[in-house]
A protein has these predicted regions:
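Acidic, glycine-rich loop-and-strand cores that form catalytic or ligand-binding grooves
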Residues: 120-157
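N-terminal leader/linker segments that precede catalytic domains of diphosphate-processing enzymes
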Residues: 1-59, 63-109, 113-114, 136, ...
Length: 205
């Protein structure tokens, strides 16, 4: 039986996160800022064409968070594994807003400086090449916006008799914004564009 003290013991010092996170996949990414020609650039990867998931797409360094690993540790580890940067060249400034994707990914983005890019040695199994975009260009060129419909398709084994309206119950649909940035022959879209947009919002007047 729970009394007042037991309730306090369970709830005190609880750190809120995301309800249902235990059923979601977790990942972390690093937004690398590079100083080049007196201007800040953002470094992007073009994923290898041989990858099973999202081949040839543009992304930030990053990947899944392993057991016992913090999101920050995962972002740094994945950056080292993918582009070969030295740990001391990765200077994290801040964590940005969490991104929850429609397919139940929790993504922890971090932003910081990547120094000494001459140390980069790409893991060609994962990364075809990298390129950089001036921060000023991204701030001056707004993305194109589109909206996908996210629809609930209920399991036919649901106990509809327990739901008001039963099989006539109207499940809500939602909208998921899809952003597209173009730079030269590159198209930055999807998850990467959403994370980028959140980062760029910090520099709006």
């Amino acid at each position: 039986m729970f009394n007042r003290q037991k309730v306090l013991d369970r709830l005190t010092n609880h750190k809120p996160y995301i309800n249902g996170s235990e059923y979601m996949r977790r990942a972390a990414v690093f937004i690398p800022m590079v100083r080049k020609d007196g201007e800040i650039h953002i470094l992007f990867e073009v994923r290898a064409s041989s990858l099973k998931h999202r081949p040839s797409e543009i992304s930030f360094p990053g990947g899944g968070i392993e057991e016992g690993e913090t999101p920050l540790q995962a972002a740094i580890r994945e950056t080292q594994e993918e582009i070969g940067s030295y740990p001391e060249d990765i200077k994290i400034i801040s964590e940005l807003d969490l991104l929850i994707t429609p397919v139940k990914y929790i993504i922890h983005p971090f932003v910081g400086y990547l120094d000494n890019i001459e140390h980069i040695k790409l893991n060609k199994d994962e990364v075809d090449h990298v390129f950089m975009v001036p921060l000023s260009y991204l701030l001056e060129n707004q993305p194109k916006r589109y909206f996908n419909t996210v629809q609930v398709l209920p399991d036919q084994n649901l106990p509809f008799d327990l739901i008001p309206g039963e099989k006539n119950y109207k499940f809500e649909n939602g909208k998921s914004q899809v952003l597209f940035y173009k730079y030269k022959d590159y198209v930055i879209w999807g998850i990467t564009a959403k994370i980028l947009y959140n980062f760029l919002e910090f520099f709006e007047d």
